[in-house]
């Protein structure tokens, strides 16, 4: 969620992501680089005069992220069907591509899918791998939507927008009709 906040404030996220303080390994949650997050909260507090904590930054980001999703919904987008990957990203796309990495793809089919590749055509293997990967992506969307407080169609729930304080009458009406 921090990425949204960085963009809203015109800040570069590189120092936060790429420069890890030496003492970071001694923090309670080293993967989060909490020292940087705390500094950004202090920075925001100093600029705005409003006391801000790292949790406040997350909440600001979450509000905007959900509001952007709602705006997309209003524009005819912002649902599960729009959360897709390009065909190319699920690959392999061509027979040649599959065959150039046949060992790798064959191993994935056997270990992850439980698909026996012996005697199968390249096209059959490609179709099986694609079907598996697309199903995995659907599972990922389910997990992301649940974590964000959205419904199975990828739309923020009324409960979510109320908890974020963005339950404006037009937002509620939109979610009731399209959510």
What are these regions (language model features)?
Residues 1-179:
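Extended C-terminal regions of large enzymes
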